[in-house]
C-alpha cells in the first residue's frame, strides 16, 4: 500500500501545520543545543516547555501582570518568554543597581521588530545601539534640540496652541460634553509639530491614528517573532512587520515632505536667522560638516519621530490622566483651581512665565506621574556582559524591564494609601522626577533616560493651568465622579481604555483685564 501525503487545503489547516512545524523546530534546536552550567537566575514563576512564561502575560496588561507576579516571586524576577531571558525590576534598590551602579553594563537596547521599523532601523536616539553614534545623537539632543533655552524658546507656541484649545472649548454649547482625549491629542500635536517642523502639518488625523496603532503594537504584550528570534519564518507568519511597516509609511511620507519643504525654504533664508525649528537645527548640523558621524536624512527622520512620540503621545497621556484624576477627586480640582485663579486674578489669560509660582499644580503633576507614568515599563535595556545583581546571575543579552508603574504604587514606598491620588504626599518631599529617586521614575534614569523631560512637562503645565483657570469641569448627568472608569489600555504609552468625555462650564474672572 502506498502512503499519500496531502497538502493542507484550507487556511486553518495551513495554520495548524505551520504551528506544529515551528514547535518541532524549536524543540529540536533545544534538544541539540549544547548543555551549559545552570546560572543562579532570579526567582520566577514556573516555566512551561517551549513557551516559558508567555501564557502568564497573555490576556492582560503587561505591567499589571508583571506587578502581580513580582508580588509573589520578588522584586527581581526572571521570566522566560519564548527563547528570551527577561528580568523584571520592581524595587528602587534593584532599579538603582541597573540604572546607576551598573548603568554602562545595561546601556544597550534589545533589537525588537516593531522598534526596528518605527526607528528607521534603530537610527533614533531611543533605540540606537550604545556606542559612538548614540553618544553623538544624545549630545545633539541635549545641547541643540531640547536644552532648557531651546524649550523656553517654544513658549509662544505653547501659549498660542493652548489658547486655541480654550477658544475651541468655549465654542461648545452650554452643558455639551466634549471629547477631551481627542482635543488634547490635537493640541499636543500642534505644539510638537510647530516646535519640530515650524508649522502644523496636514495629515494630523492620519499621523495621530498611525502613532496610536504603532504604540499599541509596541506595548501589546508578547511578539512571538521577537520571542523566537531563531525561527525567522515567524516574522512572516505573525504579520507584525507588515502591519507596522504600513503604518510607518504613512508617517514617513509626512516626514519626507517636511524635510524637502525645509530645504526649499532655506534657499532664501539668511544664515544665522532666528526662529529655527528642530528640523532646521538638524539640517544646519547636517550641512556643517563638523560631525564625526554625518547626519543622514534617515537619522533626521528618526529623530523627528522621537520628538513626536515624546511630544504628542506622552504629554497627551499625562494631561488626560491628570484631568481624569481631578474629575474623580473634585476636592483636589477645587484646590488647584483656587491657586491658579488667585494667582491670575483679574487677568484674561495666563502667562507661562508665572507658572513657577503654582506650587500645588506642580504637586498635582508629580502625583499624576507617580500613578500614571507615560511609559509604565521603561524602555527595555539589555545586559552587555554577564554580571551579578543582588546575588543573582544576569546572563549577557538578558532583557531588563523596569516596572516604573509598579514602584509608583508600592505601599513600601508610598504608604497604605499608595493607590490614592493625593498630591499632598509631595509637600516638603525631596523626591522629584529627574531620575535620582529610583522608586519614582516617570522619565527613567541614567544615560538612557528620556531627554525630553523639560519639553513634556512644559506642555502639560500650560495646558492644565489654562483648562483649570478658564473652566469648571464635571461629568455628564447621572455620572458620579468616584465611579469614573480608570481602566488602562494596552500600549507602549499608558492611555485610558475609554476616551474621556467631560462637560466644561466657562469661568469668567471678576474684573478681567
Swiss-Prot record:
<comment type="function">
    <text>Involved in the biosynthesis of macrocyclic lathyrane type diterpenoids (also called Euphorbia factors) natural products, including the cyclization route from casbene to jolkinol C, a precursor for ingenol mebutate that is used to treat actinic keratosis, a precancerous skin condition. Catalyzes the hydroxylation of (-)-casbene and 4-hydroxycasbene to produce 8-hydroxycasbene and 4,8-dihydroxycasbene, respectively. Also mediates the formation of 4-hydroxy-8-ketocasbene from 4,8-dihydroxycasbene. Together with ADH1, triggers the biosynthesis of 8-ketocasbene from 8-hydroxycasbene.</text>
</comment>
<keyword id="KW-0812">Transmembrane</keyword>
<dbReference type="InterPro" id="IPR017972">
    <property type="entry name" value="Cyt_P450_CS"/>
</dbReference>
<keyword id="KW-1133">Transmembrane helix</keyword>
<keyword id="KW-0472">Membrane</keyword>
<keyword id="KW-0408">Iron</keyword>
<dbReference type="GO" id="GO:0016020">
    <property type="term" value="C:membrane"/>
</dbReference>
<dbReference type="InterPro" id="IPR052306">
    <property type="entry name" value="CYP450_71D"/>
</dbReference>
<keyword id="KW-0503">Monooxygenase</keyword>
<comment type="similarity">
    <text>Belongs to the cytochrome P450 family.</text>
</comment>
<protein>
    <recommendedName>
        <fullName>Cytochrome P450 71D445</fullName>
        <ecNumber>1.14.14.-</ecNumber>
    </recommendedName>
</protein>
<dbReference type="GO" id="GO:0020037">
    <property type="term" value="F:heme binding"/>
</dbReference>
<keyword id="KW-0560">Oxidoreductase</keyword>
<feature type="transmembrane region" description="Helical; Signal-anchor for type II membrane protein">
    <location>
        <begin position="12"/>
        <end position="28"/>
    </location>
</feature>
<dbReference type="GO" id="GO:0016705">
    <property type="term" value="F:oxidoreductase activity, acting on paired donors, with incorporation or reduction of molecular oxygen"/>
</dbReference>
<comment type="pathway">
    <text>Secondary metabolite biosynthesis; terpenoid biosynthesis.</text>
</comment>
<dbReference type="GO" id="GO:0005506">
    <property type="term" value="F:iron ion binding"/>
</dbReference>
<dbReference type="GO" id="GO:0004497">
    <property type="term" value="F:monooxygenase activity"/>
</dbReference>
<dbReference type="InterPro" id="IPR001128">
    <property type="entry name" value="Cyt_P450"/>
</dbReference>
<dbReference type="InterPro" id="IPR036396">
    <property type="entry name" value="Cyt_P450_sf"/>
</dbReference>
<keyword id="KW-0735">Signal-anchor</keyword>
<keyword id="KW-0349">Heme</keyword>
<dbReference type="InterPro" id="IPR002401">
    <property type="entry name" value="Cyt_P450_E_grp-I"/>
</dbReference>
<feature type="binding site" description="axial binding residue">
    <location>
        <position position="450"/>
    </location>
    <ligand>
        <name>heme</name>
    </ligand>
</feature>
<dbReference type="GO" id="GO:0016114">
    <property type="term" value="P:terpenoid biosynthetic process"/>
</dbReference>
<keyword id="KW-0479">Metal-binding</keyword>
<dbReference type="Pfam" id="PF00067">
    <property type="entry name" value="p450"/>
</dbReference>
Amino acid at each position: 500500500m502506498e502512503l499519500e501525503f496531502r497538502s493542507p487545503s484550507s487556511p486553518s489547516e495551513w495554520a495548524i501545520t505551520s504551528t506544529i512545524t515551528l514547535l518541532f523546530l524549536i524543540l529540536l534546536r533545544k534538544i541539540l543545543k549544547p548543555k551549559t552550567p545552570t546560572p543562579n537566575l532570579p526567582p520566577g514563576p514556573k516555566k512551561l516547555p517551549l513557551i516559558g512564561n508567555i501564557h502568564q502575560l497573555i490576556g492582560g496588561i503587561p505591567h499589571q501582570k508583571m506587578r502581580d507576579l513580582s508580588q509573589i516571586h520578588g522584586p527581581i524576577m526572571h521570566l522566560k518568554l519564548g527563547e528570551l531571558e527577561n528580568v523584571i525590576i520592581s524595587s528602587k534598590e534593584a532599579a538603582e543597581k541597573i540604572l546607576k551602579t551598573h548603568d554602562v553594563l545595561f546601556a544597550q537596547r534589545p533589537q525588537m521588530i516593531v522598534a526596528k521599523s518605527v526607528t528607521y532601523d534603530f537610527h533614533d536616539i531611543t533605540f540606537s545601539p550604545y556606542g559612538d553614534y548614540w553618544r553623538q545623537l544624545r549630545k545633539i539632543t541635549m545641547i541643540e534640540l531640547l536644552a532648557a533655552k531651546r524649550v523656553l524658546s517654544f513658549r509662544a507656541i505653547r501659549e498660542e496652541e493652548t489658547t486655541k484649545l480654550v477658544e475651541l472649548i468655549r465654542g461648545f454649547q452650554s452643558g455639551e460634553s466634549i471629547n477631551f482625549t481627542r482635543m488634547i491629542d490635537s493640541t499636543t500635536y500642534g505644539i510638537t509639530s510647530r516646535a519640530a517642523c515650524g508649522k502644523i502639518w496636514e495629515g494630523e488625523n492620519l499621523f495621530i491614528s498611525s502613532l496610536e496603532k504603532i504604540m499599541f503594537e509596541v506595548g501589546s504584550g508578547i511578539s512571538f517573532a521577537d520571542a523566537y528570534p531563531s525561527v525567522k519564518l515567524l516574522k512572516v507568519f505573525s504579520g507584525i512587520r507588515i502591519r507596522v511597516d504600513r503604518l510607518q509609511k504613512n508617517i514617513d511620507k509626512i516626514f519626507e515632505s517636511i524635510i524637502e519643504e525645509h530645504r526649499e525654504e532655506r534657499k532664501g533664508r539668511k544664515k544665522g536667522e532666528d526662529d529655527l525649528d528642530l528640523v532646521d537645527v538638524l539640517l544646519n548640523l547636517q550641512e556643517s560638516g563638523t560631525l564625526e558621524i554625518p547626519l543622514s536624512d534617515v537619522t533626521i527622520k528618526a529623530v523627528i519621530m522621537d520628538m513626536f512620540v515624546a511630544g504628542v503621545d506622552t504629554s497627551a497621556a499625562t494631561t488626560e490622566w491628570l484631568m481624569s484624576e481631578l474629575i474623580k477627586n473634585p476636592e483636589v480640582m477645587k484646590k488647584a483651581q483656587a491657586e491658579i485663579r488667585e494667582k491670575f486674578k483679574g487677568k484674561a489669560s495666563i502667562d507661562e512665565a508665572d507658572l513657577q509660582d503654582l506650587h500645588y499644580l506642580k504637586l498635582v503633576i508629580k502625583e499624576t506621574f507617580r500613578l500614571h507614568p507615560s511609559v509604565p515599563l521603561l524602555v527595555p535595556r539589555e545586559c552587555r556582559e554577564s554580571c551579578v545583581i543582588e546575588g543573582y546571575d544576569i546572563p549577557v543579552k538578558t532583557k531588563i524591564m523596569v516596572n516604573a508603574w509598579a514602584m509608583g504604587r508600592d505601599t513600601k514606598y508610598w504608604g497604605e494609601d499608595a493607590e490614592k491620588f493625593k498630591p499632598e504626599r509631595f509637600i516638603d518631599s525631596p523626591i522629584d522626577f529627574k531620575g535620582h529617586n529610583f522608586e519614582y521614575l516617570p522619565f527613567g534614569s541614567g544615560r538612557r533616560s528620556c531627554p525630553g523631560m523639560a519639553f513634556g512637562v512644559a506642555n502639560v503645565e500650560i495646558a492644565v493651568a489654562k483648562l483649570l483657570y478658564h473652566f469648571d469641569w464635571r461629568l455628564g448627568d447621572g455620572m458620579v465622579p468616584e465611579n469614573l472608569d480608570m481602566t488602562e489600555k494596552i500600549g507602549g504609552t499608558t492611555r485610558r481604555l475609554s476616551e474621556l468625555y467631560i462637560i466644561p462650564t466657562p469661568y469668567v474672572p471678576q474684573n478681567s483685564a
